[in-house]
Amino acid sequence: MITIEDIKSAYNRINSFIVETKIYSSEKLNNNYAANIFLKNEVEQLTGSFKIRGALSALSALKEEGVEGVVAFSSGNHAQGVSKAAQIFDMKSIIVMPKDAPSNKIKKTKSNGAEVILYTRHIESREKIAEKISEERGYPLVKPFDNENIIAGQGTFGL
């Protein structure tokens, strides 16, 4: 279970790398739902998504442990987050992406220094491919879920 202390700890590890994004309120949404609704514009982040928060949190913790590289799988936003975080922390990143992922996401992931491994969706398992690479190279697999440092990092958008 992730606690507020975990989220604050993640924030302390990543705050010098993230963009402080603005919070907006929409009168139309507030009126439609009879509530105060707030929107946070995470498209302003380094990679255009909140996923960089979790990636920075996870990779900063791994870097502290002496890990030199990571493996991840994603169709786009997690791939860009992990590859950018790896670039920031001078780590190797290997990202498994589907061949039909948006070409701009593949290109951006590569431009962050990642080694991109393409697979055929619905025929191959991205998780099995990533697990095999992780085992062969000795790098941990950083999943976009089931990772407490990823979750705590994503939670920093609320601080």
What are these regions (language model features)?
Residues 1-159:
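PLP-dependent amino-acid enzyme catalytic core
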